[in-house]
Amino acid sequence: MSSIRVRQILADVMAGEEDGLPERLCRACAVAIPVTGVGLALMTPAGHGGSITTTDGAAAVMEDLQQTLGEGPCMDASRDGRPVLQSDLAVTGMSRWPSFTACALEAGIAAVFAFPLQVGAIRLGLLNLYRHTTGSLDRHQLAEALAFAEAATTMLLRLQDKRPSGQPLHPRLAEAVGSRREIHQATGMITVQAAVGLAEALLLLQAHAYSSERPLIDVAKDVVARRLRFAPEDDHHE
């Protein structure tokens, strides 16, 4: 991997406020490859730590589905420590990740490319790319994706180095972990309330967030606080 290209990416995305680093890196990646959307996720020793940022709603759906269902290209990439490149989910995905693939296709996601962020055996996170259309990454696009993954790894390490004294995680990373827990709890509650599976429960949560033009985490907090309830064979009522 060209260290010159990685340094160039870091120089470009770090020319701004620290809090916006993850967003700038993902947006730059989506333009450079190009792909429809990009997501950056945190990994912890216990597993998926949560989504740090995504470039768009479909990328957020992809991240949330894999976190909730515990399956998908991104989960495999983190577990195995190597990229997982799925150029046509409809052809290859159903046999490996049936629940994730069915929901991803419904959301318009046709191809997924997942890159682990790690230092040696230590898992830090994932850089996840997706397209609305099928097709592989060409040689140049793959090299770009690997460069952005290396840059994202460096960025996460620098954020951790700047965490407040006495805190285990930088605030941006701690926020991802907290959001992950609340979304997971809300999804579990909806499975009971609406008598549906995990995948459908997450889609109900996302549909409500979309229709009400609110962040997913805010809707999840309402479910956990019992301000919002989903009824069987019905949309929802508050």
Residue ranges and their predicted role:
Residues 1-69, 221-238:
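Intrinsically disordered, low-complexity terminal regulatory regions
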Residues 161-238:
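Signal-transducing coiled-coil/dimerization helices and immediately adjacent hinge/linker segments
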